[in-house]
Amino acid sequence: MINTKVEFVAWPKIPRAVLGTIVITEKLDGTNACVIVQDNEIVGVQSRKRMLNVGKDTDNYGFAQHVFDNQEKFLELGEGSHYGEWTGLGIQGNPHCLPEKRFFLFNTRRWGEHNPPPEGIYVVDVLYQGEYSHEVVDATMNSLLESSKEAGYKPEGCVVYFPKLEAMEKHTFEYSKGKWLGDNK
């Protein structure tokens, strides 16, 4: 017997094993942040785990206050949820030696040299874009380690984005299995 009261839910299409083009960006060591813009209004500010608000106990390293103080710039981002990393002075030991706190957008398809973000908002660096291989990821990590030594900062690692799968994975120099598992390099 067929139940006509149940709504059909299709099984998702499974992509082929060929991963195709990837984008590797630098993983910044800060705190995850997001600004939500709807109807030309900032309707939300959040961290990775919670909504934020201006105030000592409701903010996250001053990100909500920064958004409040710079609303016009953040509204220039347009509609949507704009995820990124809030990093710099006073956050995670400031391993990039930034002179102040900065917000770096993750979406390199939307933002970058081809479409610069508003002044005072940054974009994570694209380190590689092309075909996927383990060797490419390893070479990119090694290159980042060398270039960061020359620039005088300590990198956290890379994020590999698979556009075909709309998925990401992170590769870190320390705690490759997760920082809560102790020393597991």
Short names for language-model regions:
Residues 1-185:
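Core nucleotide-handling region used for phosphoryl-transfer chemistry
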